[in-house]
Structures are given as structure tokens and as C-alpha cells.
A protein has these predicted regions:
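A broad, low-amplitude sensor of folded, mature protein cores
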Residues: 1, 19, 139, 163-164
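Conserved small-residue
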Residues: 1-4, 8, 15-127, 188-192, ...
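Membrane-embedded beta-strands that build the outer-membrane beta-barrel scaffold
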Residues: 8-16, 23-31, 135-141, 146-154
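Composition- and surface-driven signal marking solvent-exposed, interaction-prone regions
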Residues: 24-28, 40-44, 148-166
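Extracytoplasmic gating/loop element in the C-terminal half of outer-membrane beta-barrel translocons
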Residues: 95, 99-104, 155-197
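Juxtamembrane/interface motifs at transmembrane-helix termini
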Residues: 43-45, 141, 169-170
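Glycine-rich, aromatic-lined ligand/substrate-binding cores of catalytic
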Residues: 77, 82-89, 128-161
């Protein structure tokens, strides 16, 4: 297959001297995108691995014609059900439910094809881990053989996958402390669902 990378990069540096003090300053930034051109197989997809986030987890990344390389693939969510009335309203609007016994604190999954069923056809491109923007700066001083420098770098526009479950079902592993912000009752969270195991 092939991948097309496009973007722009810029770096500016200034070096100068004031008496015996040498100093320099630099900034840099880049905007980049990539897209998979053509994967030469029947479905145009290189599938990601399973069991990567936790035991029995499904494929969550892939490479596919027309998408960024290694994009995240899965169900789009629309928050958490806060109460039983929200569940009833969701079902009445003919939105699909993935869970067999949905309860408050469970995730709402978006029914992409509006057929009332959440299935493989509802999985979509959820973004990718490659940043849209990278940036940085550096600052340095040199005076009579002593020098000082600072460097900073950053990125923005990328997605991150976070699993709060332990890998391998290891009973000696714990959830991260982020699980403390999970749903524990109406209005407590709209991002981390209730704990079910």
C-alpha cells in the first residue's frame, strides 16, 4: 500500500551576543496529515490486533484506504444513561442499545445507520493518535563558560485511547485512579461508566 503525508513545517532561530553573554532563541511548529492511499487486498483494510486493551477486547485500530494510518475504529458514544427515563426515551426514539440489560450508568452508543440495532455496521473512524500540530521552543544562554538552556515541546489534535481495565485479567492489577470519577448515580459522570466487574 501507500501513504500520502502532507503538511508544512517552520523553524525560526535567533543567535546573538550582548557583551560576553551569548544567547539563542528558537521556535518550531508543524502541521501534518496522512492518508492511506491503496492497500492491495480485497477489503482495503489492514486490521489491528484484538486483546490489546484488555482480555477479549476487539480490534480498536486499523489502516484503511482513505483514512489516517492506524486510526481508532469503534463505536461512537453519546454520554451515559443517567436514569431509567433516559433509557426509555432512547429506545422510544428507535436508537439502538448494545447492552442486553442496559442500566443507568451504561454507555449510549450512536446508531450510525439508524436501524435500531447497534452492530458492526455502526463502528466508525474515531480519530487517530498522530498529532495535527507539533510545536516547541528553545532558549539558551552562555556566559563565561556557564550555560543554561530550556527546551519545550508539545502536540495537539491527536486522540488517545485509555483503558481502565487491567490486561490479562490479572487480579494483582488495579484500575487507574481515574476510575474514581466513574458514574455512581445520576449526574455524577457522563464520561466514565459505572463499574460492572
Amino acid at each position: 500500500g501507500d501513504v500520502k503525508n502532507t503538511g508544512v513545517e517552520l523553524a525560526l532561530t535567533w543567535n546573538d551576543r550582548i557583551g560576553k553573554l551569548n544567547y539563542n532563541f528558537g521556535i518550531n511548529g508543524a502541521y501534518n496529515k496522512n492518508k492511506v492511499g491503496a492497500i492491495p487486498n480485497a477489503d482495503g483494510i489492514i486490521h489491528g490486533l484484538t486483546n490489546m486493551l484488555y482480555d477479549n477486547s476487539e480490534e480498536f485500530y486499523r489502516a484503511e484506504n482513505g483514512h489516517a494510518i492506524g486510526y481508532f475504529w469503534g463505536y461512537e458514544t453519546a454520554g451515559l444513561f443517567q436514569n431509567t427515563q433516559e433509557i426509555a426515551d432512547w429506545k422510544a426514539a428507535k436508537n439502538g442499545i448494545l447492552q442486553t440489560n442496559v442500566r443507568p450508568g451504561d454507555v449510549r452508543y450512536v446508531d450510525q445507520d439508524h436501524n435500531g440495532v447497534i452492530d458492526e455496521n455502526d463502528k466508525v473512524d474515531l480519530g487517530n493518535g498522530m498529532p495535527d500540530f507539533t510545536f516547541g521552543f528553545n532558549l539558551g544562554f552562555d556566559y563565561k563558560g556557564f550555560d543554561f538552556s530550556v527546551n519545550a515541546n508539545g502536540m495537539a489534535g491527536n486522540k488517545i485511547v485509555q483503558s481502565y481495565r487491567n490486561h490479562g485479567g490479572n487480579s494483582k492489577s488495579n484500575y487507574t485512579s481515574a476510575i474514581l470519577a466513574r458514574w455512581t448515580g445520576e449526574g455524577t459522570s457522563n464520561h466514565i461508566p459505572r463499574v460492572t466487574e
